[in-house]
């Protein structure tokens, strides 16, 4: 590195003090936000390189600026590793985020005003799957599909019937808060039945797909998008995969020049590192442990009747819990748990009755604690603390004791 930490602190103490404070917070908190993780030092090192200095509009071998021969090597490494990891023929590693990756797919495959089907936000979908406040809902005619009200699982027969009724040009599968395995083969059958494209947003489960613990959407989807953080444990960014050469050309044009200018090559370098890490056999064990830890926490909540785990459990890295029999709403639960240094987010549940600013539920995820080396025993203990804190949210002495117990645990599992 060009400067060391002391150089930074001397130049900008206000900023570095904030960074130090965040480092302390991450070390001393149990992180259960399902979309967050702990990246490796190698990922951070790559993202902090002088690659940030270089403009490289275009793609490897087809740049608009000179001096990009080395940049081409970096980006090609990321592309080839993504293709190998997910078994895809084409990969675009330039999207700055998952949202921009999704926007590029929409721009490539459909026109403004076209009908699209996506998962309802309260059922577990994502803002970019048609939420009215998102560009997706404002630009396209999104029709939401839901989960079954009783089982809280995807009902593929109902989705097929709905697709036959609305005749979408595109069907979006994937979720940000759905705890069960998604049957991508079924979704492809539905898409084929109505002549629609199928796009899968696997942002949340990409790491589990990579580790072999969730079926891959790549053989079934016309296009697959993902983020490179979350369970994939890389830098914040996006990635697009396809096996169709014609679609790949459209996607490349949609990303650049359609949506973005120069790619963030320092971030792409960090993506390459994360993809290499995911190709390592050790990553399979990580994916297995992520699922075991989530299941262990869900099992604890299932043993306490005042908490209701949505759909009864989990097969991936997250689950939702209805907390309204214990506290007023999910926002209150989030705040109570933050008092004991357990961080998660309030979350809508299927057929939500409260506003998204309050919600009936919380979302619990295991990727970050698993990256710190915590296992099923620690996961169960964390869930027990959560239950105890929420049931005793009006007892400061209980919260103080739990906060101390959390500190002992986080000290035993250093962030780095």
From Swiss-Prot:
This is Serine hydroxymethyltransferase. One of its GO terms (cellular component) is cytosol. GO terms for molecular function: glycine hydroxymethyltransferase activity; pyridoxal phosphate binding. The gene is glyA. Belongs to the SHMT family. The modification N6-(pyridoxal phosphate)lysine is found at residue 230. Its main location: cytoplasm. Its EC number is 2.1.2.1. Disulfide bonds: none annotated. It is an enzyme of class 2 (transferase). The record marks 229 as: Plays an important role in substrate specificity. It is found in: Cytoplasm.
């Amino acid at each position: 590195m060009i400067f060391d930490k002391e150089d930074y602190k001397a130049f900008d103490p206000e900023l570095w003090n904030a960074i130090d404070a965040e480092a302390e917070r991450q070390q001393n908190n149990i992180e259960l936000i399902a979309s967050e993780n702990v990246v490796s030092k190698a990922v951070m090192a790559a993202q902090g390189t002088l690659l940030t200095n270089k403009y490289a509009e275009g793609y490897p071998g087809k740049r608009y600026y000179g001096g990009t021969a080395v940049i081409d090597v970096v980006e090609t490494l990321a592309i080839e590793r993504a293709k190998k990891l997910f078994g895809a023929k084409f990969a675009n590693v330039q999207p700055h985020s998952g949202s921009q990756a999704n926007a590029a797919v929409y721009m490539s495959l459909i026109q403004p005003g076209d009908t699209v089907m996506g998962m309802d936000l309260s059922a577990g979908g994502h803002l970019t799957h048609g939420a009215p406040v998102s560009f997706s809902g404002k630009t396209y005619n999104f029709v939401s599909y839901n989960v079954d009200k009783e089982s809280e699982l995807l009902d593929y027969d109902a989705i097929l019937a709905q697709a036959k009724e609305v005749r979408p040009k595109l069907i979006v599968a994937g979720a940000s808060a759905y705890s069960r395995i998604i049957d991508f083969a079924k979704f492809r059958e539905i898409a084929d039945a109505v002549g629609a494209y199928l796009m899968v947003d696997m942002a949340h489960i990409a790491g589990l797909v990579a580790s072999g613990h969730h079926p891959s959407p790549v053989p079934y989807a016309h296009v697959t998008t993902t983020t490179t953080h979350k369970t994939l444990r890389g830098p914040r960014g996006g990635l697009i995969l396809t096996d169709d050469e014609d679609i790949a050309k459209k996607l490349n044009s949609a990303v650049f020049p359609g949506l973005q200018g120069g790619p963030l090559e320092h971030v792409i370098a960090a993506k390459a590192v994360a993809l290499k890490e995911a190709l390592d056999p050790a990553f399979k064990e990580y994916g297995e442990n992520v699922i075991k830890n989530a299941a262990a926490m869900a099992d604890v909540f299932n043993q306490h009747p005042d908490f209701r785990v949505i759909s009864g459990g989990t097969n991936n890295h997250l689950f939702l819990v209805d907390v309204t029999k214990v506290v007023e709403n999910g926002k209150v639960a989030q705040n109570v748990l933050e008092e004991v240094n357990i961080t998660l987010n309030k979350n809508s549940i299927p057929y939500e009755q409260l506003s998204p600013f309050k919600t009936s539920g919380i979302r619990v995820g295991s990727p970050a604690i698993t990256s710190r080396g915590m296992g099923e025993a620690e996961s169960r203990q964390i869930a027990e603390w959560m239950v105890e804190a929420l049931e005793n949210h009006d007892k400061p002495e209980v919260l103080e004791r739990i906060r101390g117990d959390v500190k002992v645990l986080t000290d035993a599992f250093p962030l780095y």
